[in-house]
Design a protein with these regions (language model features):
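NAD(P)-dependent dehydrogenase/reductase Rossmann-like domain
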Residues: 164-167, 175-286
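Residues that mark the start of a beta-strand
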Residues: 40-43, 64, 221
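N-terminal Rossmann-fold NAD(P) dinucleotide-binding loop
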Residues: 51-52
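Glycine-rich Rossmann-fold phosphate-binding loop(s) that bind the pyrophosphate
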Residues: 47-48
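Phosphate-binding beta-alpha-beta segment of Rossmann-like dinucleotide-binding domains, i.e.
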Residues: 1-41, 205
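Aromatic pocket-lining residues of Rossmann-like dinucleotide-binding sites
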Residues: 57-58, 122
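Rossmann-like adenosine-cofactor binding region
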Residues: 66, 70-162, 178
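Short, flexible coil/linker segments at domain boundaries that flank nucleotide/cofactor-interacting
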Residues: 36-37, 123, 217
């Protein structure tokens, strides 16, 4: 990292066979001097399950932590340390960061989140970390920023031809999920999330649908997948014709998902009216 540990380890390996290793170490270590993390400012783009943990860990290391996530979930917000400062825009955050890390999914809207414009807002010598998806960073803009001194170092888990061999760029071979536990954990998580969807209608980590999760309230639950179009919620609440005790709705691209808890069971006529709404894809009761 900023302490040049990778270069230092490689240099130390080259001392094998020397009869004056201790003296060589004392003389050579000066070339690997780097700044401490304590007191530095970390910007975290994306405060989901991973981003929130990174932010909290950085707080524990004595860093000032800034967070940016316009779509942060309630659960993630509750899990954040109170020391994490919320930034409304990237423009509020980037000029203050010594380090910048990104933890968002790859979507058409997040492609090249780190680009020439965002990098121009950073302070000179910023260190950028990307262990989420390679496409989140515009590689050409990043290399230009490194050549100008705007970016001091770039760490990523996604080697690419244009990145390899560049001074200050450190690539690992996509090691993010390469652990003995990951395969089991992924299977357990998938089973738990599928069970939660079947039993409660909650959605987590879907590719095409938004995350929507809320505790059960009332006697019955109606779960609806529909197009993300205007006046849909008004049409749904009008057609339910039951006392609504709780409701959740989120969208993702062209699609949206709505959960409604009602005190009494909806009639088949109510459900048919919901299914007949323009843009409705599926209606399920639990």
């Amino acid at each position: 990292g900023s302490r040049n540990m990778v270069d230092a380890v490689q240099w130390a390996q080259g001392l094998k066979g020397s009869e004056t290793i201790a003296k060589d170490v004392e003389k050579g270590k000066k070339q690997f001097v780097g700044p401490e993390l304590r007191g530095k400012t970390l910007g975290v783009i994306g405060l989901g399950a991973i981003g929130a943990r990174v932010a909290n860990a950085a707080v524990a290391l004595g860093m000032e932590v800034l967070g940016y996530d316009p779509y942060i979930s309630i659960d993630a917000a509750w899990s954040l340390s109170r020391s994490v400062q919320h930034c409304v825009t990237l423009g509020d955050m980037l000029p203050r960061c010594d380090y910048l890390t990104i933890h968002v999914p790859y979507l058409p809207t997040t492609r090249h989140t780190i680009n020439a414009q965002t990098l121009s807002m950073c302070k000179d010598g910023v260190r950028v970390l990307n262990f989420a998806r390679g496409e989140l960073v515009d590689t050409e803009a990043l290399l230009d920023a490194m050549n100008s001194g705007k970016v001091a170092q770039y760490f990523c888990d996604f080697p690419a031809e244009e990145l390899l061999g560049v001074k200050g760029v450190y690539c690992t071979p996509h090691l993010g999920a390469s652990t003995p536990e990951s395969e089991t954990n992924c299977a357990v998580m998938a089973a738990a999330e599928l069970s939660d969807y079947l039993k409660n209608g909650n959605i987590a980590h879907s590719v095409n649908l938004p995350d929507v999760s809320q505790p059960r309230v009332g006697g019955r639950r109606i779960c609806m997948i529909h197009k993300n179009i205007p006046n849909m919620i008004a049409s749904i609440t009008s057609a339910v014709r039951c006392n609504i005790e709780n409701m959740g709705n989120r969208s993702k691209g062209d699609y949206a998902y709505t959960i409604i808890d009602t005190a009494e069971a909806p009639t088949e006529a109510n459900l048919d009216e919901l299914r007949a709404i323009e843009g409705m894809i599926s209606v399920r009761t639990i």
